[in-house]
A protein has these predicted regions:
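Short, Lys/Arg-rich, polar N-terminal cytosolic tail immediately upstream
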Residues: 1-17
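Flexible interhelical linker loops that connect adjacent transmembrane helices
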Residues: 286-306
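A structural signal for multi-pass alpha-helical bundles of membrane permease subunits
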Residues: 18-290, 309, 313-459, 463-568
Length: 568
């Protein structure tokens, strides 16, 4: 007997195949993309060929042809920052991929999904706290270096040592993402396959880590600016200066917008080519391994697990805690022991900060931005789920082009400044509307997990309003909720570009930005006398992100974490 879903498919086919009405659902968000992404992008194509002056604007500034590119390629600084960017990125990808592969393989031996979630949540904790808090705790522990750390804070003043420390710290913070993706792939494969270790564990893990590494390669010339900025100082620019930090200094500190735009355009062109190539490579070889179909369960499936796997997992987690959480916890205990002596100094530091109003304002603002983001994601993803829809390839390429525009470029800064939004939180909220990586995650989850083989053999799979409401929406509710929680955590924990670039008024800063300014300020002893209250504040500003993590782990569907790979 045909299923209800199959009847929907047949009815759509009888009405004439795939309906281009699907594009009408995507039209409103596409218009928003054109206004807030494509229009500024046109400026990005012009700026590299002009000597931009703020008083004259883009149209009034003089054309200089290829001079900005000539100056760039003749500059020894560009060659150096390009080399640093590629080196640090590749070191991070290699270290994180190898470590995640081994950890996921070990955790995969645990048959209980509950214990898998417990262990994997531990690895995800650093990612869901603000980078400012994570780095502060690391630096505090290093400033009181003992048995847990080989390096002290003075090590960060040495260029060669920094090249070793940075990839390790970034891998520690982000390793939970590929691990949770691999575990989701393992469990998904076990639900439909009753074969052995090779097919149900090793291959899904390899494909998941391969997916992670490939997506990271598609952003080869982009680093996590905010994370890097907390560790960087002029004494280590030799190895620590990257394209992102160089552009930030060149544009916003030296007002060399044309030169900075030339760098951005080179980055964009290289990463666009890489992204298109890697997209089709992933689609061909990796998607089904990471997002296996669960429309049919294999016969004889039983939960697999082993005592040895649980023991190994326990020791791996203990080692991770020893290397990361333990020294931080020891530091917290030391600080709490001296807390009674510093209340007045901390009061002087924290007095006058708009913490309560900031929490309220940003919680409401981010919630609104996330809701808009979820609606935009649902509508943009719908045409990608319609089989044989005319023009779908061009639509896909358009989304990849916009995805690679990223955020925080000089052109976006000038766009929002021109609209009178400078020194407001509006750019911060508006840039949060767009996470096009989420669109491809929804598409991959829906097409591989929720559409049966029988439906895919029928030409002309949906695309009309009835299918959108009755079939598509119910199946994407769970992943879109998870992606929304991820977006909330990402926005809450981030200062760049929304605040570092657009905000100058301290009264409008987010709680995380307030925390950042405290630990970056030279006027206070935040690693000594004031550490007690700084750590308490760090714990407070980390709470929303941790709540989002717990919500996602309870919700399940952890393939959604692939959306975060584009942000790392």
């Amino acid at each position: 007997m045909p299923t209800k879903d199959k009847d929907l498919t047949m009815n759509t086919h009888e009405r004439g195949g795939p309906s281009i009405v699907a594009y009408l659902f995507a039209l409103p968000p596409v218009i928003i993309l054109l206004v807030y992404k494509v229009v500024p992008f046109i400026t990005a194509l012009i700026l590299p060929f002009k000597e931009y002056e703020l008083t004259k604007g883009v149209s009034g500034s003089a054309w200089v042809g290829m001079r900005n590119f000539s100056d760039l390629f003749n500059s020894p600084f560009f060659t150096k920052v390009l080399s640093n960017t590629v080196t640090l990125k590749l070191e991070y990808i290699f270290l994180c991929s190898i470590s995640a592969f081994l950890i996921a393989l070990i955790l995969g031996f645990i048959g209980s999904k509950f214990w898998q979630r417990v262990f994997s949540t531990i690895f995800l904790l650093p990612y869901f706290m603000p980078a400012a808090v994570f780095i502060y705790l690391v630096l505090y522990a290093m400033s009181n270096a003992g048995m847990f750390f080989m390096y002290s804070t003075e090590s960060l003043m040495d260029p060669e040592t920094f090249r070793l420390i940075y990839p390790i710290l970034e891998a520690i913070r982000n390793i939970g993402i590929p691990v949770i993706i691999a575990l989701a792939a393992i469990n998904g494969r076990r639900a439909v396959d009753n074969r052995g270790f090779l097919h149900t564990q090793l291959i899904p893990t390899l494909k998941s880590i391969g997916l992670f590494a490939l997506i990271q390669l598609s952003t080869l010339l982009t680093m996590d600016y905010e994370f890097l900025s907390y560790l960087q100082n002029p004494t280590i620019y030799e190895t620590a200066d990257t394209l992102d930090t160089f552009v930030y200094r060149t544009a916003l500190m030296n007002n060399e917008f044309g030169l900075a735009s030339a760098i951005w355009l080179i980055k964009y062109a290289v990463q666009l080519v890489l992204s298109i190539l890697i997209f089709f490579l992933i689609k061909r070889f990796f998607i089904k391994g990471v997002f296996p179909s669960q429309t049919k369960r294999a016969e004889g499936i039983r939960k697999r697990g082993s005592f040895v796997g649980v023991v190994l997992s326990f020791f791996v987690v203990q080692l991770y805690l020893l290397l990361t959480t333990a020294p931080l916890a020891v530091s917290v205990v030391e600080v709490f022991g001296d807390g009674s002596q510093i209340s007045q100094a901390s009061s002087d530091l924290l007095s006058g900060l708009p913490l309560h109003s900031s929490f309220t304002t940003y919680a409401i603002g981010i919630t609104f931005a996330v809701l808009v983001n979820m609606v935009i994601t649902i509508l943009l993803a719908y045409p990608l789920t319609v089989k044989d829809l005319p023009g779908r390839l061009l639509y896909t390429i358009f989304l990849i082009i916009v995805l690679n525009m990223g955020m925080g470029g000089v052109h976006e800064y000038l766009f929002f400044r021109g609209k009178g939004m400078h020194n407001t939180i509006l750019p911060y909220l508006i840039t949060g509307f767009f996470t096009l990586a989420n669109v491809f995650v929804i598409k991959a989850i829906y097409n591989t997990r929720y559409v049966s083989v029988e439906e895919r053999t029928v030409k002309g799979v949906e695309g009309d309003p009835e299918s959108f409401v009755k079939r598509y929406l119910p199946r994407v509710v769970k992943p879109i909720l998870g992606l929304g929680a991820l977006q909330f955590a990402f926005m809450w924990n981030s200062c760049y570009p929304g605040q570092l670039v657009y905000l100058a008024d301290p009264n409008k800063f987010s709680p995380v930005m307030i925390f950042r300014n405290i630990i970056m300020g030279a006027q206070a002893d935040v690693y000594g006398q004031l550490a007690f209250d700084v750590i308490k504040l760090g714990a407070a500003v980390s709470i929303p992100g941790i709540i989002m993590l717990l919500f996602i782990m309870i919700l399940g569907g952890h393939e959604i974490f692939t959306a975060q790979i584009w942000k790392n």
